[in-house]
């Protein structure tokens, strides 16, 4: 093992070289202070490897590299060339899919099957934005015969990006794709719980033809490296995915520093509403997927299931049966649906919420306990007999815990659905088109799924209302986060006076 790379063999037999350093200006380097931190395998609570920790000085170095690239030759690279680079990066992700999926299962604990889905989604996202690179156009605006007016969509500059641990590589692609397509440079910080896949992805940056300094990948802690990014006077924009609590601090830091542009994709407490006329088999399947997918570690998880009175008892019985069928265990087993939570901290936090629900008088219909004795595994948990004001029904738990609540009619469903401070997503299950449209229009949520849940597609915008964020990820709308509009007025006529 060197200081900058380690040979790792994952439990499914994949052997690869894992970068450990900070990827700055096209090379892996040690941190300025020589600090490292361990990343933990959540399946067995044992260290995997130690990676270099970025400090404020390292952030300064990465930002300087990004600024140099942005002000230098990168600005002369044509949009079509940028697009080809992203497409090449997508190809490399697909080439190394088995390695990348294995890293995610090892470092994050997600099912290897689900991890392969993440890699495919990340590659697709990069390829999608590669296609957009040469299709971002301004307008000509006709005001009179003596003036030519037009607009240009120009890159913002150096972008700081802070990504979460629940979808490490997918979020890496969500952030990198639109930023590079529009001609920006990037300093991206991986989550301290899951740095490995982002560092491996950095290792193929040069192979994709992306010049040194354009993408810089650092590992470190939010309170140090993340804070340095948020406060940095030479970062023009910051993008963050994570908790609403941290999102507030980033917004404050941006305001206190250089008023950098900010996009935030934050928490949720999303309602998944099931009406009497719903196809119950379909609704049960999507409700189960909506909350227990990715171990409940989804910002848009359908963590509040609202069921109309006429089918409530039947739905509860069926949901209990379905939740018990979810295989919890080894993420490298192909039939595993739910692996461990990502960390001891997250495990403890979820168990505290479960205990709070019990103490508040909610009924544990399924689960409510630790799964096994090793690793951060939690049983799929279903609470009934809940009220809207309960803590477990108001705060984001971010784990395999769902509440099920009864409602009377459309108005009641809308009222309960909108009764939290969040507004990221919602689901509606009904055969009535009028009901679906009426309720989807009334819910204050950035994404509404009808007769499905958790189907995020990179061509479609994603983001929240209320305290669930600012701006949109994905689709063409994400490009707006990484460009600024310049208006040019060209006088064609004679002098004004």
Curated annotation (Swiss-Prot):
One of its GO terms (molecular function) is aldehyde dehydrogenase (NAD+) activity. Its EC number is 1.2.1.3. InterPro entries: Ald_DH/histidinol_DH (IPR016161), Ald_DH_C (IPR016163), Ald_DH_CS_CYS (IPR016160), Ald_DH_CS_GLU (IPR029510), Ald_DH_N (IPR016162), Aldehyde_DH_dom (IPR015590). It catalyses: an aldehyde + NAD(+) + H2O = a carboxylate + NADH + 2 H(+). The active site is at residues 265, 299. The keyword Secreted does not apply. SUPFAM superfamilies: ALDH-like. The keyword Nucleus does not apply. The record marks 166 as: Transition state stabilizer. This is Aldehyde dehydrogenase. It comes from Aspergillus niger.
């Amino acid at each position: 093992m060197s200081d900058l790379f380690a040979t790792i063999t994952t439990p499914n037999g994949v052997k690869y070289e894992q970068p450990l350093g900070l990827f700055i200006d096209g090379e892996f380097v040690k941190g300025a202070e020589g600090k490292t931190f361990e990343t933990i395998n959540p399946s067995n609570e044992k260290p995997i490897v130690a990676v270099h920790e970025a400090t404020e000085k390292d952030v300064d170095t990465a930002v300087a590299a990004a600024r140099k690239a942005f002000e230098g030759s990168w600005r002369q690279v044509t949009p079509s060339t940028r697009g080809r680079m992203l497409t090449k990066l997508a190809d490399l992700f697909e080439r190394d899919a088995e390695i990348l999926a294995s890293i995610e299962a090892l470092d994050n604990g997600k099912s290897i099957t689900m991890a392969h889905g993440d890699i495919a989604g990340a590659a697709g996202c990069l390829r999608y934005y590669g296609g957009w690179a040469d299709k971002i156009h301004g307008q000509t605006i006709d005001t009179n015969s003596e003036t030519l007016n037009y607009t240009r969509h120009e890159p913002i500059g150096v972008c700081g990006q802070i990504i979460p641990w629940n979808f490490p590589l997918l979020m890496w692609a969500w952030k990198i794709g639109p930023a590079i397509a529009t001609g920006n440079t990037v300093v991206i910080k991986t989550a301290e719980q899951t740095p490995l896949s982002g560092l491996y992805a950095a290792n193929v940056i040069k192979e994709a033809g992306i010049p040194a300094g354009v993408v810089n990948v650092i590992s470190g802690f939010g309170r140090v490296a993340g804070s340095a990014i948020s406060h940095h006077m030479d970062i023009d924009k910051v993008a963050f995915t994570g908790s609403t609590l941290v999102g507030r601090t980033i917004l404050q830091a941006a305001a206190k520093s250089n008023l950098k542009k900010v996009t935030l994709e934050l928490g949720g407490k999303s309602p998944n509403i099931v009406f009497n006329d719903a196809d119950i088999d379909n609704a049960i399947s999507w409700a189960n997927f909506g909350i227990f997918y990715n171990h409940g570690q989804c910002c848009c998880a359908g963590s509040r299931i609202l069921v109309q009175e006429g089918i409530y008892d039947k739905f509860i019985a069926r949901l209990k049966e379905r939740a018990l069928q979810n295989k919890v265990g080894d993420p490298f087993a192909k039939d595993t649906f739910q692996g461990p939570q990502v960390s001891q901290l997250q495990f403890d936090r979820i168990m505290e919420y479960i205990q709070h629900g019990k103490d508040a008088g909610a009924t544990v219909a399924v689960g409510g306990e630790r799964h096994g004795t090793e690793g951060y595994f939690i049983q799929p948990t279903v609470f009934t007999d809940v009220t809207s004001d309960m803590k477990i029904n108001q705060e984001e738990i971010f784990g395999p815990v769902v509440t099920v609540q009864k409602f009377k009619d459309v108005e009641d469903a809308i009222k309960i659905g909108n009764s939290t401070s969040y507004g990221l997503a919602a689901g509606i299950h009904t055969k009535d088109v009028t009901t679906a449209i009426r309720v989807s229009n009334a819910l204050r949520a950035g994404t509404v799924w009808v007769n499905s849940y958790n189907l995020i597609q990179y061509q479609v915008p994603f983001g929240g209302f209320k305290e669930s964020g600012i701006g949109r990820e994905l689709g063409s709308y994400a490009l707006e986060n990484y460009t600024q509009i310049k208006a040019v007025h060209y006088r064609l006529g004679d002098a004004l006076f």
